[in-house]
Amino acid sequence: MKRSLKNNPFVANPLLRKMEKLNRREDKILIRTWSRASTIILTMIGHTIAIHNGKEHLPIYITDYMVGHKLGEFAPTINFHEHAKNDNKSRRSKMRIDY
């Protein structure tokens, strides 16, 4: 369900304060955050934010097409590694039971 238009987009307060301070000083430094639920707003464009994926911080450069999306959408939390082709234990095989 979409967020009501009466409410402002959610941005964590520490992240918002850091963005405003960097925009006033016109600095371009890496910002580390654990707030994956924060919405990307216009003041974040042009900055690099390191978003935590549960294991490490992934640096993401914010562009204008990302506005309105959540930070967590750009930092995947799981990586699927394919099973080896010749590993029969990890692949499911059909089990036949003869009576």
UniProtKB/Swiss-Prot annotation:
The keyword Ribonucleoprotein applies. Coiled coil: none annotated. It is found in: Plastid, Chloroplast. One of its GO terms (cellular component) is mitochondrial small ribosomal subunit. Its main location: plastid. The keyword Ribosomal protein applies. Transmembrane segments: none annotated. InterPro entries: Ribosomal_uS19 (IPR002222), Ribosomal_uS19_bac-type (IPR005732), Ribosomal_uS19_CS (IPR020934), Ribosomal_uS19_SF (IPR023575). GO terms for biological process: ribosomal small subunit assembly; translation. PROSITE patterns: RIBOSOMAL_S19. Gene3D superfamilies: 30s Ribosomal Protein S19, Chain A (3.30.860.10). Keywords: Chloroplast, Plastid, Ribonucleoprotein, Ribosomal protein, RNA-binding, rRNA-binding. One of its GO terms (molecular function) is structural constituent of ribosome. Pfam families: Ribosomal_S19. Belongs to the universal ribosomal protein uS19 family. Protein S19 forms a complex with S13 that binds strongly to the 16S ribosomal RNA. This is Small ribosomal subunit protein uS19c. It comes from Oenothera argillicola (Appalachian evening primrose).
